[in-house]
Amino acid sequence: TSNGFAVLMPDIVYKMDDPGMSALWAVLPAVDAAVKTGVVDANKMGLHGHSWGGYQTSFLITQTNRFKAAAAGAPLTNMISMYDLIYWNSGGGNMSIFEASQGRFLGGPWENWDAYERNSPIYHVKNVQTPLLMLHNDKDGAVDFTQGIEYYNALRRLKKPVILVQYLGENHGLGKLENRKDYAVRMLEFFNHHLKGMAAPVWMEKGVPRLKLGDHLNERAF
């Protein structure tokens, strides 16, 4: 453990046409097994993932309330809109990701609409009850920034507990050391609050105005 947290990394066994549901079917039994060891408090569990793991995190919280808090980095949230976007880091399209790679879909959305919709977090967003910390950067060249914005705006519209963190100019991950340190501390503060009952820092309670973001980051520099 580190900082009082035990970490579980479950293996996901995938079924075609159900990348999101497959995560649900794999993660929940793994969590049940972890709880049975006595190491894990079933009432104080968090969930975290980035990129494809961010997608799975965003999807899981639309299907279960088992987790008290979740953090998702650069998540795919709408399989249908993402399908036709560009993977800017390579310059190619996203279609192959969905039909021949991680998506594991049998065809495109126009011939397999129900599967794409069923496995897209955005279409189940009304079910979310879990507080979410979402990281998505404006220059993400793998998962388009609009994916994070779609999910964030829907959650906000429905008055769901969500915080969006963005590091200007960063890509799919965090390249700058100061940003990696900053986000690591924010994520720890987020989980400390929701899982350990520690006081929420000001940035979580009041947010940070876009025009004051630079000053805020300088004040928190590590």
Regions found by a protein language model. Give the residues of each.
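Active-site-proximal cap/loop segments of hydrolase catalytic domains
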Residues: 1-222
